[in-house]
Amino acid sequence: MSEARKTPQSHFTGPVVIDPLTRIEGHLRIEVEVKDGRVSEARSVGTLYRGLETILVGRDPRDVQHFTQRTCGVCTYTHALASTRALEDAIKVEIPKNATYIRNLVLGMQYLHDHIVHFYHLHALDFVDVTSALQADPVKAAKICSSVSPRPASADGFKAVQAKLKAFVESGQLGPFTNAYFLGGHPAYYLDPEANLIATAHYLEALRLQVKAARAMAVFGAKNPHTQFLVAGGVTCYESLTPERIAEFEGLYKEVNDFVNQVYIPDLLLVGGAYKDWTKIGGTANFMTFGEFPGDERNLESRWFKPGVVFDRKLEALPFDPSKIEEHVRHSWYAGDAVHKPFQGVTEPKFTFMGDKDRYSWMKAPRYDGRAVETGPLAQVLVAYLKGNAEVVPVVDSVLQTLSLTPGDLFSTLGRTAARGIETAVIAKKTGEMLQEYKENVASGDKKIV
Protein backbone atom coordinates (compact mmCIF):
# COMPACT_ATOMS: atom_id res chain seq x y z
CA MET A 1 0.00 0.00 0.00
CA SER A 2 1.27 3.48 -0.83
CA GLU A 3 2.95 5.53 1.90
CA ALA A 4 2.11 9.17 2.57
CA ARG A 5 4.49 11.63 0.93
CA LYS A 6 4.93 15.37 0.76
CA THR A 7 3.53 17.36 -2.17
CA PRO A 8 6.28 18.71 -4.46
CA GLN A 9 6.60 22.47 -4.03
CA SER A 10 6.94 24.92 -6.92
CA HIS A 11 8.68 28.30 -6.95
CA PHE A 12 6.97 29.43 -10.13
CA THR A 13 6.10 33.11 -10.58
CA GLY A 14 3.57 34.23 -13.19
CA PRO A 15 -0.03 33.78 -14.32
CA VAL A 16 -1.84 30.43 -14.44
CA VAL A 17 -5.13 29.96 -16.30
CA ILE A 18 -7.25 26.80 -16.17
CA ASP A 19 -10.00 26.98 -18.79
CA PRO A 20 -12.24 25.06 -18.67
CA LEU A 21 -12.11 23.67 -15.16
CA THR A 22 -13.35 20.13 -15.71
CA ARG A 23 -14.31 19.11 -12.18
CA ILE A 24 -17.80 20.52 -12.61
CA GLU A 25 -20.65 20.43 -15.10
CA GLY A 26 -20.62 23.97 -16.44
CA HIS A 27 -18.35 26.67 -17.77
CA LEU A 28 -15.70 27.80 -15.31
CA ARG A 29 -12.32 29.48 -15.83
CA ILE A 30 -9.82 29.99 -13.02
CA GLU A 31 -7.20 32.75 -13.25
CA VAL A 32 -4.46 33.02 -10.63
CA GLU A 33 -1.35 35.12 -10.17
CA VAL A 34 1.48 33.17 -8.56
CA LYS A 35 4.54 34.53 -6.74
CA ASP A 36 7.26 32.07 -5.71
CA GLY A 37 4.86 29.14 -5.77
CA ARG A 38 2.08 30.82 -3.79
CA VAL A 39 -1.17 32.25 -5.12
CA SER A 40 -1.24 36.02 -4.65
CA GLU A 41 -4.46 36.78 -6.55
CA ALA A 42 -7.31 34.62 -7.86
CA ARG A 43 -10.47 35.03 -9.91
CA SER A 44 -13.26 32.51 -10.58
CA VAL A 45 -14.75 33.30 -13.98
CA GLY A 46 -18.17 31.99 -14.92
CA THR A 47 -17.89 32.13 -18.71
CA LEU A 48 -21.49 31.37 -19.69
CA TYR A 49 -24.50 33.64 -19.29
CA ARG A 50 -27.38 31.19 -18.83
CA GLY A 51 -30.00 33.84 -18.18
CA LEU A 52 -32.41 31.59 -16.30
CA GLU A 53 -33.77 34.46 -14.25
CA THR A 54 -34.51 36.38 -17.45
CA ILE A 55 -36.08 33.34 -19.13
CA LEU A 56 -38.44 32.80 -16.20
CA VAL A 57 -39.89 36.31 -16.12
CA GLY A 58 -43.61 36.15 -16.86
CA ARG A 59 -43.82 32.35 -16.87
CA ASP A 60 -46.22 30.20 -14.88
CA PRO A 61 -44.40 29.42 -11.60
CA ARG A 62 -45.53 25.79 -11.86
CA ASP A 63 -43.29 25.43 -14.92
CA VAL A 64 -40.18 26.90 -13.31
CA GLN A 65 -38.77 23.56 -12.11
CA HIS A 66 -38.56 22.30 -15.69
CA PHE A 67 -36.28 25.20 -16.64
CA THR A 68 -34.11 25.46 -13.53
CA GLN A 69 -33.09 21.81 -13.51
CA ARG A 70 -31.62 22.29 -16.99
CA THR A 71 -28.84 24.14 -15.15
CA CYS A 72 -27.04 20.80 -14.97
CA GLY A 73 -27.17 17.34 -16.50
CA VAL A 74 -25.94 15.68 -13.30
CA CYS A 75 -27.49 17.37 -10.25
CA THR A 76 -30.76 18.05 -12.08
CA TYR A 77 -33.33 17.04 -9.51
CA THR A 78 -32.02 19.33 -6.78
CA HIS A 79 -32.83 22.43 -8.84
CA ALA A 80 -36.35 21.17 -9.56
CA LEU A 81 -36.87 20.42 -5.88
CA ALA A 82 -35.63 23.85 -4.81
CA SER A 83 -37.97 25.56 -7.29
CA THR A 84 -40.93 23.47 -6.15
CA ARG A 85 -40.16 24.17 -2.49
CA ALA A 86 -40.02 27.90 -3.21
CA LEU A 87 -43.47 27.77 -4.78
CA GLU A 88 -44.83 25.71 -1.88
CA ASP A 89 -43.41 28.18 0.61
CA ALA A 90 -45.15 31.02 -1.24
CA ILE A 91 -48.58 29.36 -1.26
CA LYS A 92 -48.20 27.65 2.15
CA VAL A 93 -49.27 24.18 1.02
CA GLU A 94 -48.98 21.03 3.13
CA ILE A 95 -47.11 18.03 1.70
CA PRO A 96 -48.46 14.47 2.23
CA LYS A 97 -46.18 12.08 4.11
CA ASN A 98 -45.80 9.75 1.12
CA ALA A 99 -44.75 12.64 -1.11
CA THR A 100 -42.05 13.64 1.38
CA TYR A 101 -40.78 10.05 1.48
CA ILE A 102 -40.70 9.77 -2.31
CA ARG A 103 -38.93 13.12 -2.72
CA ASN A 104 -36.36 12.13 -0.11
CA LEU A 105 -35.78 8.73 -1.70
CA VAL A 106 -35.13 10.27 -5.11
CA LEU A 107 -32.88 12.86 -3.47
CA GLY A 108 -30.96 10.11 -1.66
CA MET A 109 -30.24 8.40 -4.97
CA GLN A 110 -29.27 11.76 -6.48
CA TYR A 111 -26.63 12.16 -3.77
CA LEU A 112 -25.29 8.63 -4.31
CA HIS A 113 -25.16 9.12 -8.07
CA ASP A 114 -23.46 12.51 -7.83
CA HIS A 115 -20.81 11.50 -5.33
CA ILE A 116 -19.87 8.29 -7.15
CA VAL A 117 -19.54 10.28 -10.39
CA HIS A 118 -17.50 12.99 -8.70
CA PHE A 119 -15.05 10.72 -6.89
CA TYR A 120 -14.36 8.39 -9.80
CA HIS A 121 -15.09 10.28 -13.00
CA LEU A 122 -14.41 13.93 -12.15
CA HIS A 123 -11.79 13.75 -9.40
CA ALA A 124 -9.95 10.42 -9.69
CA LEU A 125 -7.37 11.53 -12.25
CA ASP A 126 -6.10 14.05 -9.70
CA PHE A 127 -4.72 11.13 -7.67
CA VAL A 128 -4.77 8.05 -9.94
CA ASP A 129 -2.04 7.47 -12.55
CA VAL A 130 -3.89 5.27 -15.02
CA THR A 131 -0.83 4.24 -17.04
CA SER A 132 0.98 3.14 -13.87
CA ALA A 133 -1.66 0.42 -13.52
CA LEU A 134 -0.01 -1.37 -16.46
CA GLN A 135 3.00 -2.14 -14.22
CA ALA A 136 0.87 -3.55 -11.39
CA ASP A 137 0.88 -7.14 -10.16
CA PRO A 138 -2.78 -8.27 -10.47
CA VAL A 139 -2.35 -10.92 -7.75
CA LYS A 140 -0.99 -8.35 -5.31
CA ALA A 141 -3.74 -5.89 -6.29
CA ALA A 142 -6.39 -8.53 -5.56
CA LYS A 143 -4.87 -9.22 -2.13
CA ILE A 144 -4.80 -5.51 -1.28
CA CYS A 145 -8.36 -5.04 -2.47
CA SER A 146 -9.63 -8.04 -0.48
CA SER A 147 -7.85 -6.79 2.64
CA VAL A 148 -9.74 -3.48 2.66
CA SER A 149 -13.15 -4.62 1.37
CA PRO A 150 -15.61 -7.37 2.34
CA ARG A 151 -16.10 -8.05 -1.37
CA PRO A 152 -13.81 -10.75 -2.83
CA ALA A 153 -11.40 -9.51 -5.51
CA SER A 154 -10.10 -11.55 -8.43
CA ALA A 155 -6.63 -11.41 -9.94
CA ASP A 156 -8.20 -12.47 -13.24
CA GLY A 157 -10.51 -9.46 -13.07
CA PHE A 158 -7.57 -7.11 -12.64
CA LYS A 159 -5.71 -8.84 -15.49
CA ALA A 160 -8.71 -8.18 -17.74
CA VAL A 161 -8.67 -4.50 -16.79
CA GLN A 162 -4.95 -4.32 -17.57
CA ALA A 163 -5.54 -5.90 -20.98
CA LYS A 164 -8.30 -3.42 -21.74
CA LEU A 165 -6.13 -0.52 -20.58
CA LYS A 166 -3.13 -1.76 -22.61
CA ALA A 167 -5.23 -1.98 -25.78
CA PHE A 168 -6.57 1.51 -25.14
CA VAL A 169 -3.11 3.05 -24.68
CA GLU A 170 -1.59 1.23 -27.66
CA SER A 171 -4.45 2.26 -29.94
CA GLY A 172 -3.27 5.87 -29.78
CA GLN A 173 -6.92 6.97 -29.74
CA LEU A 174 -6.82 8.52 -26.29
CA GLY A 175 -9.63 11.01 -26.76
CA PRO A 176 -9.55 13.50 -23.85
CA PHE A 177 -6.29 11.95 -22.63
CA THR A 178 -4.34 12.92 -25.76
CA ASN A 179 -1.23 14.91 -24.71
CA ALA A 180 -2.39 14.71 -21.08
CA TYR A 181 0.50 16.01 -19.00
CA PHE A 182 -0.56 13.95 -15.98
CA LEU A 183 -0.17 10.50 -17.56
CA GLY A 184 2.99 8.54 -16.96
CA GLY A 185 4.82 9.42 -13.79
CA HIS A 186 3.90 12.92 -12.65
CA PRO A 187 5.64 13.54 -9.28
CA ALA A 188 2.39 14.55 -7.57
CA TYR A 189 1.02 11.01 -8.04
CA TYR A 190 1.66 8.94 -4.90
CA LEU A 191 -0.26 5.68 -5.41
CA ASP A 192 1.73 2.55 -6.21
CA PRO A 193 0.87 0.56 -9.38
CA GLU A 194 -1.44 -1.86 -7.55
CA ALA A 195 -3.49 0.94 -5.97
CA ASN A 196 -3.68 2.62 -9.37
CA LEU A 197 -4.94 -0.63 -10.91
CA ILE A 198 -7.59 -1.02 -8.20
CA ALA A 199 -8.80 2.55 -8.67
CA THR A 200 -8.81 2.23 -12.47
CA ALA A 201 -10.85 -0.97 -12.32
CA HIS A 202 -13.35 0.68 -10.01
CA TYR A 203 -13.45 3.78 -12.23
CA LEU A 204 -14.74 1.53 -15.01
CA GLU A 205 -17.15 -0.30 -12.70
CA ALA A 206 -18.53 3.00 -11.44
CA LEU A 207 -19.58 3.88 -14.99
CA ARG A 208 -22.10 1.06 -14.75
CA LEU A 209 -23.10 1.75 -11.16
CA GLN A 210 -23.95 5.40 -11.76
CA VAL A 211 -26.47 4.18 -14.34
CA LYS A 212 -28.11 2.06 -11.62
CA ALA A 213 -28.48 5.13 -9.40
CA ALA A 214 -29.93 7.14 -12.28
CA ARG A 215 -32.40 4.34 -13.04
CA ALA A 216 -33.49 4.30 -9.40
CA MET A 217 -34.24 8.01 -9.61
CA ALA A 218 -36.28 7.41 -12.76
CA VAL A 219 -38.35 4.66 -11.12
CA PHE A 220 -40.16 7.35 -9.11
CA GLY A 221 -39.07 10.47 -11.01
CA ALA A 222 -40.18 9.27 -14.49
CA LYS A 223 -36.83 10.01 -16.16
CA ASN A 224 -33.22 10.93 -15.57
CA PRO A 225 -31.79 13.44 -16.11
CA HIS A 226 -34.53 16.00 -15.47
CA THR A 227 -37.24 14.33 -13.42
CA GLN A 228 -40.91 14.93 -14.24
CA PHE A 229 -42.82 14.01 -11.08
CA LEU A 230 -42.85 17.08 -8.83
CA VAL A 231 -45.84 19.38 -8.39
CA ALA A 232 -46.54 22.02 -5.78
CA GLY A 233 -48.14 20.04 -2.98
CA GLY A 234 -46.62 16.63 -3.64
CA VAL A 235 -45.71 14.25 -6.45
CA THR A 236 -47.57 12.71 -9.40
CA CYS A 237 -46.08 9.21 -9.54
CA TYR A 238 -49.00 7.05 -8.39
CA GLU A 239 -47.17 3.97 -9.66
CA SER A 240 -44.68 4.53 -6.83
CA LEU A 241 -47.33 3.16 -4.46
CA THR A 242 -47.32 -0.27 -6.11
CA PRO A 243 -45.26 -3.18 -4.72
CA GLU A 244 -43.70 -3.78 -8.14
CA ARG A 245 -42.39 -0.23 -8.48
CA ILE A 246 -41.14 -0.16 -4.89
CA ALA A 247 -39.34 -3.48 -5.40
CA GLU A 248 -37.68 -2.17 -8.56
CA PHE A 249 -36.38 0.87 -6.69
CA GLU A 250 -35.21 -1.29 -3.79
CA GLY A 251 -33.27 -3.66 -6.05
CA LEU A 252 -31.38 -0.81 -7.70
CA TYR A 253 -30.77 0.90 -4.35
CA LYS A 254 -29.24 -2.27 -2.90
CA GLU A 255 -26.78 -2.56 -5.79
CA VAL A 256 -25.65 1.03 -5.35
CA ASN A 257 -25.51 0.72 -1.56
CA ASP A 258 -23.27 -2.35 -1.85
CA PHE A 259 -20.92 -0.48 -4.20
CA VAL A 260 -20.71 2.47 -1.81
CA ASN A 261 -19.79 0.31 1.19
CA GLN A 262 -17.69 -2.34 -0.53
CA VAL A 263 -15.89 -0.26 -3.16
CA TYR A 264 -16.15 3.52 -2.80
CA ILE A 265 -15.41 3.82 0.93
CA PRO A 266 -12.48 1.33 0.86
CA ASP A 267 -11.07 3.19 -2.17
CA LEU A 268 -11.44 6.50 -0.35
CA LEU A 269 -9.48 5.20 2.63
CA LEU A 270 -6.84 3.64 0.36
CA VAL A 271 -6.31 6.94 -1.44
CA GLY A 272 -6.54 9.05 1.70
CA GLY A 273 -3.79 7.08 3.37
CA ALA A 274 -1.39 8.00 0.57
CA TYR A 275 -2.29 11.68 0.31
CA LYS A 276 -2.03 12.79 3.94
CA ASP A 277 -0.31 16.01 2.87
CA TRP A 278 -3.63 17.07 1.32
CA THR A 279 -4.60 18.10 4.86
CA LYS A 280 -2.27 21.08 4.39
CA ILE A 281 -3.91 22.45 1.24
CA GLY A 282 -7.31 23.53 -0.02
CA GLY A 283 -8.72 24.72 3.26
CA THR A 284 -11.42 27.36 3.61
CA ALA A 285 -12.63 29.00 6.82
CA ASN A 286 -16.41 29.40 6.69
CA PHE A 287 -19.19 26.90 5.95
CA MET A 288 -22.96 26.92 5.57
CA THR A 289 -25.65 24.31 5.01
CA PHE A 290 -29.44 24.48 4.73
CA GLY A 291 -29.58 20.86 5.84
CA GLU A 292 -31.59 18.24 3.96
CA PHE A 293 -34.04 15.33 4.08
CA PRO A 294 -36.99 16.98 5.84
CA GLY A 295 -39.64 15.26 7.88
CA ASP A 296 -41.81 18.34 7.31
CA GLU A 297 -41.08 20.50 4.26
CA ARG A 298 -42.26 23.60 6.11
CA ASN A 299 -39.74 23.27 8.94
CA LEU A 300 -35.98 23.56 8.35
CA GLU A 301 -35.25 22.06 11.76
CA SER A 302 -37.14 18.88 10.81
CA ARG A 303 -34.36 18.04 8.38
CA TRP A 304 -32.22 15.01 9.16
CA PHE A 305 -29.11 16.98 8.19
CA LYS A 306 -29.61 20.09 10.31
CA PRO A 307 -28.97 23.60 8.97
CA GLY A 308 -26.04 25.49 10.46
CA VAL A 309 -22.91 27.55 9.89
CA VAL A 310 -19.27 27.24 10.94
CA PHE A 311 -16.97 30.28 11.04
CA ASP A 312 -13.18 30.64 11.17
CA ARG A 313 -12.51 26.88 11.26
CA LYS A 314 -13.88 26.68 14.79
CA LEU A 315 -15.30 23.30 15.76
CA GLU A 316 -18.63 24.88 16.65
CA ALA A 317 -21.88 24.83 14.66
CA LEU A 318 -23.87 28.06 14.91
CA PRO A 319 -27.58 28.60 14.13
CA PHE A 320 -28.48 29.21 10.50
CA ASP A 321 -30.44 32.34 9.53
CA PRO A 322 -31.54 32.44 5.86
CA SER A 323 -32.18 36.19 6.11
CA LYS A 324 -28.40 36.72 6.26
CA ILE A 325 -27.90 35.48 2.68
CA GLU A 326 -27.19 38.21 0.10
CA GLU A 327 -26.07 38.39 -3.53
CA HIS A 328 -23.28 40.71 -4.69
CA VAL A 329 -22.58 41.73 -8.30
CA ARG A 330 -19.83 44.30 -7.77
CA HIS A 331 -17.30 42.17 -9.68
CA SER A 332 -19.75 40.44 -12.04
CA TRP A 333 -20.97 41.24 -15.53
CA TYR A 334 -24.21 42.78 -14.27
CA ALA A 335 -25.30 46.38 -13.97
CA GLY A 336 -24.95 48.18 -10.66
CA ASP A 337 -23.23 47.52 -7.37
CA ALA A 338 -26.25 47.03 -5.11
CA VAL A 339 -26.47 44.11 -2.70
CA HIS A 340 -29.77 42.21 -2.72
CA LYS A 341 -31.50 39.41 -0.89
CA PRO A 342 -31.97 36.46 -3.30
CA PHE A 343 -35.74 37.01 -3.53
CA GLN A 344 -35.14 40.68 -4.40
CA GLY A 345 -32.34 40.01 -6.86
CA VAL A 346 -31.87 41.93 -10.09
CA THR A 347 -30.33 40.26 -13.15
CA GLU A 348 -29.37 42.89 -15.71
CA PRO A 349 -26.42 41.65 -17.81
CA LYS A 350 -23.67 44.14 -18.65
CA PHE A 351 -20.65 42.46 -20.23
CA THR A 352 -17.32 44.29 -20.39
CA PHE A 353 -14.61 41.95 -21.67
CA MET A 354 -12.64 38.85 -20.71
CA GLY A 355 -9.53 39.81 -18.81
CA ASP A 356 -11.18 42.67 -16.94
CA LYS A 357 -9.86 42.37 -13.38
CA ASP A 358 -12.66 44.48 -11.92
CA ARG A 359 -15.71 42.81 -13.48
CA TYR A 360 -14.82 39.33 -14.66
CA SER A 361 -17.60 36.76 -14.25
CA TRP A 362 -21.22 35.87 -15.07
CA MET A 363 -21.50 34.43 -11.57
CA LYS A 364 -23.03 36.45 -8.78
CA ALA A 365 -21.27 36.30 -5.42
CA PRO A 366 -23.53 35.00 -2.62
CA ARG A 367 -22.53 35.88 0.93
CA TYR A 368 -23.74 34.81 4.37
CA ASP A 369 -23.55 37.60 6.92
CA GLY A 370 -21.04 39.29 4.62
CA ARG A 371 -18.75 36.27 4.42
CA ALA A 372 -17.90 33.90 1.60
CA VAL A 373 -18.92 30.43 2.78
CA GLU A 374 -18.33 26.94 1.44
CA THR A 375 -21.35 24.72 0.91
CA GLY A 376 -21.57 21.07 -0.11
CA PRO A 377 -20.45 17.80 1.51
CA LEU A 378 -17.81 19.22 3.85
CA ALA A 379 -20.17 21.91 5.16
CA GLN A 380 -22.99 19.41 5.68
CA VAL A 381 -20.78 16.81 7.36
CA LEU A 382 -19.10 19.40 9.60
CA VAL A 383 -22.40 20.79 10.85
CA ALA A 384 -23.88 17.32 11.36
CA TYR A 385 -20.76 16.17 13.21
CA LEU A 386 -20.58 19.24 15.42
CA LYS A 387 -24.31 19.03 16.18
CA GLY A 388 -23.93 15.41 17.25
CA ASN A 389 -25.86 13.63 14.49
CA ALA A 390 -25.93 10.06 15.83
CA GLU A 391 -25.45 8.49 12.40
CA VAL A 392 -22.73 10.86 11.21
CA VAL A 393 -20.48 11.11 14.28
CA PRO A 394 -19.31 7.46 14.36
CA VAL A 395 -18.58 7.43 10.62
CA VAL A 396 -16.53 10.63 10.84
CA ASP A 397 -14.65 9.31 13.88
CA SER A 398 -13.95 6.01 12.11
CA VAL A 399 -12.54 7.73 9.02
CA LEU A 400 -10.41 10.09 11.10
CA GLN A 401 -9.07 7.19 13.17
CA THR A 402 -8.31 5.06 10.10
CA LEU A 403 -6.39 7.91 8.46
CA SER A 404 -4.81 9.13 11.75
CA LEU A 405 -6.39 12.57 11.36
CA THR A 406 -7.98 15.05 13.75
CA PRO A 407 -11.30 16.90 13.31
CA GLY A 408 -9.29 20.02 12.45
CA ASP A 409 -7.81 18.20 9.45
CA LEU A 410 -11.26 18.20 7.84
CA PHE A 411 -10.66 21.83 6.83
CA SER A 412 -8.64 20.78 3.79
CA THR A 413 -8.65 19.11 0.39
CA LEU A 414 -8.38 15.67 1.97
CA GLY A 415 -11.08 16.57 4.48
CA ARG A 416 -13.39 17.69 1.68
CA THR A 417 -12.76 14.49 -0.28
CA ALA A 418 -13.33 12.39 2.85
CA ALA A 419 -16.51 14.32 3.68
CA ARG A 420 -17.99 13.48 0.28
CA GLY A 421 -17.46 9.79 1.00
CA ILE A 422 -18.77 10.10 4.56
CA GLU A 423 -21.87 11.88 3.29
CA THR A 424 -22.37 9.14 0.70
CA ALA A 425 -22.11 6.37 3.30
CA VAL A 426 -24.55 7.90 5.77
CA ILE A 427 -27.05 8.88 3.06
CA ALA A 428 -26.89 5.37 1.62
CA LYS A 429 -27.84 3.98 5.04
CA LYS A 430 -30.50 6.65 5.59
CA THR A 431 -32.05 5.98 2.17
CA GLY A 432 -32.54 2.34 3.14
CA GLU A 433 -34.21 3.40 6.38
CA MET A 434 -36.49 5.88 4.61
CA LEU A 435 -37.44 3.22 2.07
CA GLN A 436 -38.52 0.86 4.86
CA GLU A 437 -40.55 3.63 6.52
CA TYR A 438 -42.19 4.44 3.19
CA LYS A 439 -43.11 0.79 2.60
CA GLU A 440 -44.66 0.57 6.06
CA ASN A 441 -46.63 3.78 5.54
CA VAL A 442 -48.04 2.56 2.22
CA ALA A 443 -48.86 -0.83 3.76
CA SER A 444 -50.82 0.95 6.49
CA GLY A 445 -53.26 2.16 3.83
CA ASP A 446 -51.97 5.70 3.22
CA LYS A 447 -52.16 6.32 -0.54
CA LYS A 448 -52.04 10.12 -0.59
CA ILE A 449 -49.21 11.68 -2.62
CA VAL A 450 -50.59 15.13 -3.52
Task: Please place each PLM-identified region on the residue numbering.
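Active-site bordering "gate/hinge" segments
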Residues: 2-450
